[in-house]
Amino acid sequence: MAQALIGRQELQPSVPVEGAPSYAKGRVRLWFRPGFHLDQDDLDERWQANTGERVEDVLFLSKHAAASGRPCLTVHPVGVPHLNADETPPYGGRSGTAPPPSPRLAKIWQSLLVHADDPRIPEFEVSLEVTHHGPSQKAPAAFLEVGSTADTWGHEGAADVWADVIISLLKEELMGGSTPAGPPHIPVLVTLGGGHYAPRANQMAALEGALLGHMLANHSLPFKRNEDGTVHGPWAQAVDVALDASRAAHPTRDVVVSLDRKSFRGWERRALFDHLEGRHVQVIDTATHRTMLDGP
């Protein structure tokens, strides 16, 4: 992916950072890091310490591994908000935390969808994934991935498609400017429930103008219920972290939640509704979301 970007001659060689090659143009930087991304915590602060440049957003260009082995291009936020502080995350990050999702997350997804039938990737699917794995950092982040096995990680067509998406997404930043923010009435969507490939978010974030925050699958919302009916478990912590981090990515906007209701048991839904009501967070369906995007 990175080589495909460099091949477009948009980015020029710059000064190595931490001994690793870097490239630059306008306000965009490309950093070739050795090894795995997942355990590289605080890359934003490390970059700033070495260059003096404050990091606005981090897009990780990465491989994606899946047991299914199906060829796919995926994008997702990062974090492990559902883990207790005494748990060791199996794939990086800091337990009970999540960086803000990239404010460009929905735009990345919408741009990727344009290439769903691209002849360069006839065998590939495209999809969002829910929030998962590390690394940890303060700046917003998203992973842009090629999956799902060694047979497809080096696929030239997939790398070219991602290069197209990134250059289109960052065209203003490559020229030294900034992409204008969307209308102020548009809320940030957080989704709760469903499976790993975020079917609800795939649909809702595809709409023009949509903004997307964290997405938590059922496996990241662990519920427990006592014999007396009281509900506990790290699900509430995970929800709070996802909401707060999504708001941090879009500090002037409202955050709304959409639930995959059928994926929860009745008592889990009630606990979620009560918790979100206590936080004054609106729960919406797809029709309401469309109305919100249309404007007041």
Give residue ranges: language-model regions.
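N-terminal catalytic or cofactor-binding beta/alpha core of small enzyme domains
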Residues: 1-138, 149-150, 156-160, 167-201, ...
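Short secondary-structure boundary/capping segments
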Residues: 205-209, 274
